[in-house]
Design a protein with these regions (language model features):
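Eukaryotic tandem repeat interaction scaffolds
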Residues: 148-237
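Structural signature of tandem alpha-helical TPR/SEL1-like repeats
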Residues: 2, 32-41, 66-78, 99-112, ...
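Eukaryotic, compositionally biased intrinsically disordered regions
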Residues: 76, 82, 86-87, 96-98, ...
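Alpha-solenoid helical-repeat scaffolds
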Residues: 1-108, 112
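Helix-start (N-cap) detector for alpha-helical repeat units in TPR-like alpha-solenoids
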Residues: 19-20, 52-54, 87-88, 121-122, ...
Length: 251
């Protein structure tokens, strides 16, 4: 991204004539949760190469995050028509079902993707999230660990493990998982938001406030993070007031 945004216009012009470059930029923007900009680059890539299959799993995730139901369904149909056995097609189809809250159908698609591409970390991770939606946390953990075996730097699987642990009440393990995910992807404010919330649930108000502030500094428009920070500050002030009042109440 630094090279493509750098001071040499000729480099930028040549690079952006290649569909694969747009896909790589789209992937990077996806990891930074800049989904609207990511969508633009993936659309340009497909306009250049309509039969492009590589990276389309990430494009389908971008469309999922943006709730582009029609575009996501069209992408899945195109990929299935090109190669009904490809993992990319099954992942796009799974994201289509998941967006419609058909989690069992989505899970089956993602599991099929793991069968045709056992090395695809994302397929295991997405299957893990669907297992979690289906109230199968043990299966979700196994799938997230499979994703980690495929790719040790697959931060999405760590975030999934954090979600499982948090639901189970293991705040310390959840915070460790989110912290590891952020060490891999240091440009994702959502991971900081999740880490802050986990620390808050663990009773570490100071740590949570510090992490929330880092997330806000990274993404100033993060309204939910600002709300969480404000609510925690208010609760902290109230707790301090109660502590000051308690000696008087005892007398």
């Amino acid at each position: 991204l630094e090279l493509l945004c750098g001071p040499v216009p000729s480099v930028r012009r040549r690079a952006y004539r290649i569909a694969g470059v747009h896909c790589l930029v789209g992937r990077a923007l996806h990891d930074m949760t800049e989904y609207t900009d990511a969508e633009m680059h993936f659309r340009r890539a497909r306009a250049m190469e309509p039969y492009l299959c590589m990276h389309m799993d990430i494009y389908s995730l971008v469309l999922f995050q943006l709730h582009r139901e029609v575009a996501l369904s069209a992408l899945a149909q195109d990929l299935l028509a090109m190669d009904p056995r490809s993992a990319m097609a099954h992942i796009a189809a799974g994201n289509t079902w998941s967006l419609q809250h058909q989690h069992d159908a989505a899970y089956q698609c993602f599991r099929q993707a793991t069968l045709v591409a056992p090395e695809c970390a994302y397929a295991y991770t997405l299957a893990g999230y669907e297992a979690l939606e289906l109230e199968q946390p043990a299966r979700a953990v196994r799938l997230f660990l499979c994703a980690r075996r495929c790719d040790r730097r697959h931060w999405n699987a760590l975030a999934g493990l954090g979600q499982v642990y948090l639901r189970q009440g293991y705040e310390l393990r959840a915070s460790e998982a989110y912290a590891q995910a952020f060490l891999i992807n240091r440009h994702n404010a959502v991971l900081l938001d999740l880490l802050g919330w986990t620390l808050e649930q663990a009773g570490d108000a100071d740590g949570a406030l510090a992490v929330y502030q880092r997330a806000i500094d990274m993404q100033p428009k993060a309204a939910m993070t600002r709300l969480k920070k404000a609510q925690l500050l208010l609760a902290t002030v109230r707790a301090a007031d109660d502590l000051r009042l308690s000696p008087r109440e005892c007398t």
